[in-house]
Amino acid sequence: MTLAKIELLKQLLRDNEAKTVLKQTTVDQYNIIRKFNTSRIERNPSLRMKWAMCSNFPLALTKGDMANRIPLEYKGIQLKTNAEDIGTKGQMCSIAAVTWWNTYGPIGDTEGFEKVYESFFLRKMRLDNATWGRITFGPVERVRKRVLLNPLTKEMPPDEASNVIMEILFPKEAGIPRESTWIHRELIKEKREKLKGTMITPIVLAYMLERELVARRRFLPVAGATSAEFIEMLHCLQGENWRQIYHPGGNKLTESRSQSMIVACRKIIRRSIVASNPLELAVEIANKTVIDTEPLKSCLAAIDGGDVACDIIRAALGLKIRQRQRFGRLELKRISGRGFKNDEEILIGNGTIQKIGIWDGEEEFHVRCGECRGILKKSKMRMEKLLINSAKKEDMKDLIILCMVFSQDTRMFQGVRGEINFLNRAGQLLSPMYQLQRYFLNRSNDLFDQWGYEEPPKASELHGINELMNASDYTLKGVVVTKNVIDDFSSTETEKVSITKNLSLIKRTGEVIMGANDVSELESQAQLMITYDTPKMWEMGTTKELVQNTYQWVLKNLVTLKAQFLLGKEDMFQWDAFEAFESIIPQKMAGQYSGFARAVLKQMRDQEVMKTDQFIKLLPFCFSPPKLRRNGEPYQFLRLMLKGGGENFIEVRKGSPLFSYNPQTEVLTICGRMMSLKGKIEDEERNRSMGNAVLAGFLVSGKYDPDLGDFKTIEELEKLKPGEKANILLYQGKPVKVVKRKRYSALSNDISQGIKRQRMTVESMGWALS
């Protein structure tokens, strides 16, 4: 149907007789009937597309120069029609036209393509540099798992990503950035620079940025590696009866944020559980924790998953968590049923009576431990049935033991032979169920001997399992192994849970789904830098981490600390930050180091020779009560040793791997990390009169007054009452009269005034001398 035909039809319709004929004549073209007489949603779009693609010319060309470049035919193959299409008012073309265009079509300006389509070019780079191994044929056990479809630059929630994309592409229209957006300012700046001047439409840029920032996860059947670098090539790597060995090339994009987030959350929980109010402390530390440059809360909101520790901190911060339950390494998701808890006194196998919360009711769960998955059916104090799949022996064994303990089966209680007095990392006694869990994971034979055996089912796809985790013609009672695949259970739904003071997560039904005892005790090194901006957390770190955190804190509070020191306030040494630092000083040496460090600092103040780097270096050592020699003199040291040996020491008169200073550049290097002192070392170090450079709380009121007596020292000034006056030597020994303020003035104001006066004096002296 062309436009010319439509014009003819319009002319015909003006004639009443012709109109009647047209109305009564049937339309015999199915396509026309289909196109103009139905408005329903296609029920089977896939079939419709396949049917359409079978026709000779299924694709429409838009009008324009580009379409005109495609010839009618190429080497005897017809590429497009001459006829005009009624729907698009263009021409229709064949599938071969696409191939012709890709092969012989014009090449436009490709400048900026690599920057815009960076994720695709990185994928090509990984593919170009990949290592391909042999293909093996045979049964492939693929398990449906929730996997990330492609590697990301930085994962964030969709709403946060849309704000970041707006900030990158349309900074003027985006308005004032939210705090959650501003966290990613380095990424925003980098992307703006990269995309500057590209002629590609913003909608394409936005789509590509979304691909780099928003995670797309699907449940896919997978055998082997599940990282995004493998999943993007999954279609080439495995089928139902074949597998291809493959290792992606280039730098593997590991999710460092996720790993560092887990390390941080585990440490926060370990530190919090020893506090009088674990929840309060966990929230305080979590809100002051930064991973790289991003707050921990932002990471927890952006990154899907993590482990138990992450979910506990999420709940503490008021974020939603995935629907799942934990019991140590065992992860569970309820299929059916519900239990009710009642406290009962249970006589266990070692003759002791334990008060334990017993769950009553028939329940069914999906269970998982490592790579071993299964289905558990339990009732009150009985494990009815456990169906598991084949996996590593260690995972199978742990899953079976944990399910037996979780089911609270009477045989499990009777299997206890030794003492149950396990402690957590904080030195606290574990609750009875976690005691039993630890006991049987260490002494599995006690449990299996008590459990008993039976004949396995006769079904061909099932087999028995013995205490050595081998296939057997007898099986542990109620435990069966299936040859079929048990899919990984999905936990896509999120829910809001309440959290107790002791960091236990409770559902609305009152069911405890996980707690601090379920957090893994494995310790690993974070891939990204974690900063805990609270001294309460520092003692959990290594010696180097504690040194770095302490000196960072001193630099941050340098003005206040220096002012207190110059005013002779001895209680200034009693900061929480220094209490944490004391934990890495050998106990026998803490008092001696304190006496030495205090004596050096006092000498600096008395002799009016301020050295800021030395002040920073020695200040943390002053926390402990000072210990002196019998004659009242301090001990002398050239090197201050810290716990851990090796490079863990600080040189008093020179630099060391932990602490060094370059006076030319005014840069401190703490544990390899450079920190500038520019702007923090004022003129007091360049002038003789160090002590009088800062007069916090005093006002210079005039010239020397002989009626007020001799010049006062800093210590004597401190004893003056508000409004009292005194003589003092300022700057280069200039005699002046000062008055103590009646209200306490801001330290920073007095310090800045002191420095300003000092500069003016030095300048005037220079003018006078010239």
UniProtKB/Swiss-Prot annotation:
GO terms for biological process: 7-methylguanosine mRNA capping; cap snatching; DNA-templated transcription; symbiont-mediated suppression of host gene expression; symbiont-mediated suppression of host mRNA transcription via inhibition of RNA polymerase II activity; viral RNA genome replication. Pfam families: Flu_PB2_1st, Flu_PB2_2nd, Flu_PB2_3rd, Flu_PB2_4th, Flu_PB2_5th, Flu_PB2_6th, Flu_PB2_7th. InterPro entries: Flu_PB2_2nd, Flu_PB2_6th, Flu_PB2_C, Flu_PB2_CAP-bd, Flu_PB2_middle, Flu_PB2_N, INV_PB2, PB2_helical. GO terms for molecular function: RNA binding; RNA-directed RNA polymerase activity. Keywords: Cap snatching, Eukaryotic host gene expression shutoff by virus, Eukaryotic host transcription shutoff by virus, Host gene expression shutoff by virus, Host nucleus, Host-virus interaction, Inhibition of host RNA polymerase II by virus, mRNA capping, mRNA processing, Viral transcription, Virion. Gene3D superfamilies: Polymerase Basic Protein 2, C-terminal domain. Its main location: virion. It is found in: Virion; Host nucleus. One of its GO terms (cellular component) is host cell nucleus. A motif (Nuclear localization signal) lies at residues 740-743. It comes from the Viruses. Influenza RNA polymerase is composed of three subunits: PB1, PB2 and PA. Interacts (via N-terminus) with PB1 (via C-terminus). Interacts with nucleoprotein NP (via N-terminus). Belongs to the influenza viruses PB2 family. Plays an essential role in transcription initiation and cap-stealing mechanism, in which cellular capped pre-mRNAs are used to generate primers for viral transcription. Recognizes and binds a wide range of cap structures of target pre-RNAs which are subsequently cleaved after 10-13 nucleotides by the viral protein PA. Plays a role in the initiation of the viral genome replication and modulates the activity of the ribonucleoprotein (RNP) complex. HAMAP family: INV_PB2. This is Polymerase basic protein 2. The gene is PB2.
